[in-house]
């Protein structure tokens, strides 16, 4: 929700100023297209989440479209032509998915290089493989590994400072537990000390028994 709100605020400002005239949103899955369209509608931006590659022209009532990365890869030339036709803001949601396949990365670059503005979003600015993420700058660290360079990062500490998230606390518990088994034997164990899975489970049940 945080990334979406930020991106739509940027889109609203750019549309209002005339810097862009259309918005293209690219996301990993079909259902996310509809989520983006619903969120955009709440701020007065009309996005078509049902746009298909065979459709051709976009309806005049829409400010833009929502696409999947796979949809772009299926016809990059079509989406490049659309991007060329109007001053376009392209929002690339979860951009790290753009490196899922070589063809996807190539298609995204082909389709959206002409965009007036590009906004790439991700909460995961890295990949477990070495596939490059489209439109992302990399810089080698001391070990020689390439690290992505964000234009702007907003982390947990920032959100905590701004009061938009609650602090996460991990509580440690300890204590001596005593219980009787079904056979009538009395067992004692202390939470926080090394125990077998079975003993730990029984000790927790005892501790949480109202």
Residue ranges of each PLM-predicted region?
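Interdomain helical connector at the RecA1-RecA2 junction of SF1/SF2 helicase-like NTPases
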Residues: 130-210
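Conserved Walker A/P-loop ATP-binding site and its immediately adjacent core
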Residues: 4-9, 19-42
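Conserved nucleotide-binding/hydrolysis micro-motifs of P-loop NTPases
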Residues: 30-32, 70-73, 96-97, 124-128, ...
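Short, well-ordered alpha-helices that flank and scaffold nucleotide-derived cofactor binding pockets
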Residues: 12-16, 38, 110-113
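SF2 helicase catalytic motif II
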Residues: 69, 81-120, 124-127
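Hydrophobic/aromatic beta-strand patches that form the interior of the parallel beta-sheet core
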Residues: 24, 65, 91, 119, ...
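Inter-Walker segment of RecA-like/P-loop motor cores
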Residues: 41-77
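Short glycine-/polar-rich loops that comprise or flank the Walker A/P-loop
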Residues: 20-21, 86-87, 114-117, 164-168
